[in-house]
Amino acid sequence: MITQNSIPEVKEDFIGYALHERRIRLPQFQDLGPADLVTLTKYLPTSSNTNAINSTSRNGAAIIQSPAAVVADDSAASMATNGDASDTAVTTNYTNASIYSSSRNANDGAPMVAELHPLDKLKDEVGTFFYSMGVDTSGPTSIAIFLKEISEVISEKPQVWFGRKKTFNVARISFSTWNAFRRCDINVVVHIPGSIQNFIVDCNGESQNIEMCADYDLIWAETFVSGVVRSIMLMKENAEEGELQNLVETLILNPFTAGQIDDVPEMFIDLFPIVYHKGPLLGAPYYITNVTNTNNYLVETLVEIVKLTRNVSRAEIMLKNLATDNPEAIIILIKIFLVCDQELDAIKLTYDMLSQDKIINNTNNRMDYKSELLCLQAQFLIDKRQDYSLAQNIAQEAVNCSPSEFRPWYLLSKVYVKLNDIENALLILNSCPMSPLKEKYVLKRVAPLPSNNSLHLPLPIDVVLDEVTSLNPQDVQNEHRSADPMLVNLAASNLKSTFQLAYRLLTEIVQITGWENLLKYRSNIFVMEEEYQKSSSSLPKDVNKQEEQPLRAKRLCERWLDNLFMLLYEDLKMYTLWQTEQLYMDAQNNNHNKLTFEWELFGLCARRLGHFPEAAKAFQNGLSQRFSSRCARKLLEYCINERQRVKNFINSPNSHDMVPEIVSSRIRELDNSIIDLCVKICCWNHRWYTEFSISLLDCLSVVIQDMSLTKVSNEISSRYPETVLNLVQENLLNFFTTCTIGCYDA
């Protein structure tokens, strides 16, 4: 439920500032594009303002005229104050004022202002904006419903605006969303009271009425799909970072439950064939070099939606129909079967596609598709069957098919690690094609903040959980400044994209070999600096050729891998120091006098090195002092993995030695921890205007699978206030009731 306190806003210097900034940056948008933009024009209701609004609504032609046909009124200028010198709303004189730089004056923004708003100015009007994700963008009606809800929330009661209560009405509200397939902005403007205006703005800044387009329905289908892909990929791509995003003025809604008209997951599945061939236009995850029809953000989103909703049958029918003309689409179905625990079906389909090579022969990117199938096979053998010898052969074939792709090389190196073939693992890792310039999908600020005092970040008071919502950001900042610099400056924590994955492999290797032996392996297979300098100097004519042979057999270590060795050394050094200190403190029965932020950093360091129990203990120590969202998320991840480990052990041959009561007690303990952590993270997300989290849905589904929805709801009800239960019900539990086609027991 959206309230005044759940809407972050940025105050504009002049009406239309954010829209103008977005328009001039349209050519710079890449792949999935930016978050949606919502702009509002608010005013304090007076008799003159009411008359002006009513007059404008009667003259509808002035409102809905084509944006390109409107000419800016350069003489318009006004300054209004809402009774507080620090809260001054300025409609800038377009001929004199400049924004941020002398090269760009406010006259640039005048056309946009005139296009989206009537020329009559209201007294005491304020322009604000915020970003949004997850809104149903399937058509102008669904967007208008959302905008109307926002305007009613703002107007229903006095708003606490920069410390003062003010009764605002909304005169105009607009919504801009990026159609990633056509690289254009779709704009919907609602005039209150009045009409709805919707049009396209292309990368050249030219506007066109959508209703005049011959492919009207296709444009809205693409816009809807673009919005859903952005919402899902924002969470999935940043899962390792805890789904964090730094654009604080963003309202993130659940795209599955925010549908105003139709069922969003089902609509996405049904529309998928329409945009299938355009999927590569959206881009692909950071580890993919060659973007294909089956390896892109569109496909990743479909797989994630089916995994969450368990609507496998609908997706299977759709993909098999699609595969009639596009046989490679079966690869997507195989991915869905694998993530939805239908492994036998996935294996059979994979075998059929590889054995009937003619299916792949008739498609473009044949080797890429074959490599993708082989990678799926290898991943399955590594994770599920632990058949590393067979996985090694398959991964090698995948490398031969796509030598420029990172994933086949990564899987091959991982297999060698599992086989304890360290030399080959390092050689293959050194050969991995890295993508240093490709980043994960993150939100970026389109309209710069006009000033430090322009952010309006209300505290959601509808849900209060003291240990979470009462956390003082200033105290956290003080902790960050006081933390151990050696911990804070560990560079491995800043690794991105494929380097993050490569470092993970290196830590797996060092767990097997130890640091000293790893250095020996390194010197055996890579040319060390001293050897290189010696070989580059002039050699005597009578040098023994046999002495040159060992050096010739060695490889040059890539600079990025050399750097990872250094980062690994720093992590190991810090981990050893902390472990030694903890052992000493435990022996002395002394308390560990550490900050929560320091426990968090140490936990992350231990986690990077693969010491998961030690990492979990550090996160628990941090949470015992105050709430930390990162500690909570990483501890939640540990609880899920530990729960799965216990379940796997029960099904293993050695499980007969374990007492069933002990196993049940451990599972129950982990379930309680998972529920508590999910609730607290949900409250924290709500505090920062985020009502959607894939990781929380994933984690809670594990518990609901065993306990049922009703029991989980009762557990939350018995431990937390009703407002907290209602929040969790709305943001998490309702999803399992309405979007999972009855896969979870009520």
UniProtKB/Swiss-Prot annotation:
GO terms for biological process: cellular bud site selection; chitin biosynthetic process; Golgi to plasma membrane transport; protein transport. Keywords: Golgi apparatus, Membrane, Protein transport, Transport. The keyword Membrane applies. It is found in: Golgi apparatus, trans-Golgi network membrane. GO terms for cellular component: exomer complex; membrane; trans-Golgi network transport vesicle. Gene3D superfamilies: Tetratricopeptide repeat domain. It holds the Pfam family ChAPs. It is a peripheral membrane protein. InterPro entries: ChAPs (IPR015374), TPR-like_helical_dom_sf (IPR011990). Member of the CHS5-ARF1P-binding proteins (CHAPS) which mediates export of specific cargo proteins, including chitin synthase CHS3. May be involved in positioning the proximal bud pole signal. This is Bud site selection protein 7. It comes from Saccharomyces cerevisiae (strain ATCC 204508 / S288c). The gene is BUD7.
